[in-house]
């Protein structure tokens, strides 16, 4: 018995001779080699879980997170993260503002994160060259940022139809349009050496870079864009004809899934066809002055133009179900508030259509469209918007986080973003207890309607346009 116990006790355990230690070391070596060859996003965690963690990060942190490792950069710039953020309901809305620098007239983009109240400057848009409406990248000294030049508006361009084409010839680029689809920004067309371009550029916020994509079928400048059913629609604008600039009634649609442009039926401009004489038909130019996606359709207000006058002639509605245009209700089209001659801004918030109407040099009105009564109603009678005669867009509207936002520039070159929680028409019943909406009839309460959410001085820069991206 004693011999048995002695024999049993004489057996050395693995840890006594270092066998387990060597085995442990070899395992660690094999695992480290495996991790080196196939590094995980987060050590010791499956990549599926790591991706869930990255997806829940605030977007503002992705720029720095991409520098952690190559695998993190690949994950953050991949489409799977975008899909996962949307699936988890953690995608965020950011406001992207396009500005024009006063010193060199270049376009610059700035993104605003309303959650962290931080700003991010986007990389400069790539260099381009022009040849017959087509674009090529990489020509030194020629940048997409030159597309809009000081003092050039749609009204200036249309004067070219009346024998003043040299105005466009003196400006290298102007008149690009912007839009959004599938979580990316798009810059479309514009002029190059008095020729309308077909080119389209896309900014991917995950990759943080610009890329040229499929060109439009027609060269356009000052066209209107809108998003509907995950497709980017483009209508109107001007192009080059046999006798100079020609207004366009055509439209086309871009599918980001296929990268293909498809033609859409032309707008009819029926009011143009009803003109009594051929002289008036030649003198008055049909212009699409805006476009917005509203109630599952595209709404395009229109005007007839003869320098220096614009005449509102209602508008048309595109129905994607029937693939056809129909006349816009009279009250909607003829009463659509105008920002300035040739341009009508609007924003849709929680299914309601809003527009800003400048009433005096330093005041404006916010109006909401009532589809039941086919009329525009004032919701705020005093909006502090400045009068900048040389500015293309002294103020902008945007629907962000379910609220209406007003972007304005003050005399000190400070860009202010103002937000309103709730707007009711002036003739609506008083809001229920606990609601924050103010009655626009009470002047002392007007200032309480708007809340300043951000301000930043961008030196001498003009507002051009804005878009909202949710990713």
Stretches with model-predicted labels:
Residues 25, 36-38, 116-119, 148-175:
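Internal amphipathic alpha-helical repeat/solenoid segments
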Residues 42-44, 83-102, 132-141, 164-188, ...:
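Conserved short beta-strand element of beta-propeller blades
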Residues 107-117, 198-207, 246-259, 312-323, ...:
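Beta-propeller blade signature
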Residues 121-127, 211-217, 262-268, 326-330, ...:
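Beta-propeller fold detector
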Residues 409-471:
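Blade-level signature of beta-propeller repeat domains, shared across WD40, Kelch, NHL, RCC1
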């Amino acid at each position: 018995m004693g011999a048995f116990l002695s024999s049993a006790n004489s057996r050395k355990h693995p840890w006594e001779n270092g066998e387990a230690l060597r085995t442990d070391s070899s395992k660690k070596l094999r695992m480290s080699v495996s991790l080196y060859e196939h590094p995980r996003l987060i050590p010791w965690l499956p990549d599926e879980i790591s991706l869930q963690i990255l997806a829940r990060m605030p977007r503002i942190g992705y720029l720095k997170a991409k520098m952690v490792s190559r695998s993190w950069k690949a994950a953050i710039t991949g489409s799977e993260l975008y899909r996962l953020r949307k699936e988890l309901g953690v995608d965020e809305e950011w406001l992207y503002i396009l500005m024009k620098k006063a010193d060199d007239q270049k376009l610059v983009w700035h993104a605003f994160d309303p959650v962290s109240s931080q700003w991010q400057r986007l990389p400069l848009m790539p260099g381009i060259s022009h040849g017959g409406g087509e674009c090529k990248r990489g020509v030194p000294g020629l940048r997409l940022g030159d597309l809009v030049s000081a003092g050039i508006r749609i009204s200036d361009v249309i004067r070219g139809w009346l024998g003043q084409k040299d105005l466009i010839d003196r400006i290298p680029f102007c008149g690009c349009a912007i839009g959004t689809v599938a979580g990316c920004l798009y810059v479309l067309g514009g002029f190059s050496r008095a020729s309308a371009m077909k080119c389209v550029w896309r900014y991917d916020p995950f990759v943080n870079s610009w890329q040229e994509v499929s060109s439009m079928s027609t060269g356009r400048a000052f066209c209107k864009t809108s998003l509907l059913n995950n497709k980017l629609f483009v209508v109107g604008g001007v192009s080059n004809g046999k006798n100079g600039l020609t207004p366009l009634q055509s439209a086309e649609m871009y599918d980001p899934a296929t990268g293909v442009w498809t033609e859409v039926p032309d707008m009819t401009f029926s009011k143009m066809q009803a003109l009594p004489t051929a002289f008036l038909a030649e003198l008055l130019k049909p212009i699409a002055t805006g476009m917005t996606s509203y109630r599952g359709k595209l709404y395009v207000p229109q005007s007839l133009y003869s320098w220096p006058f614009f005449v509102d002639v209602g508008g048309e509605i595109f129905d994607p179900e029937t693939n056809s245009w129909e006349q816009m209700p009279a009250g909607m089209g003829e009463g659509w508030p105008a920002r300035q001659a040739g341009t009508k801004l609007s924003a849709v918030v929680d299914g309601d259509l809003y527009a800003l109407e400048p009433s005096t040099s330093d005041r404006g009105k916010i109006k909401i469209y009532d589809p039941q009564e086919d009329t525009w109603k004032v919701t705020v009678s005093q909006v502090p918007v400045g009068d900048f005669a040389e500015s293309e867009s002294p103020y902008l509207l945007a629907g962000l986080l379910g609220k209406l936002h007003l972007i304005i520039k003050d005399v000190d070159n400070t860009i202010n973003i103002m937000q309103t929680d709730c707007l009711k028409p002036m003739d609506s019943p008083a809001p229920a207890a606990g609601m924050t909406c103010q009655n626009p009839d009470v002047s002392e309460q007007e200032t309480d309607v708007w809340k300043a959410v951000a301000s930043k001085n961008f030196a001498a820069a003009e507002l051009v346009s804005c878009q909202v991206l949710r990713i």
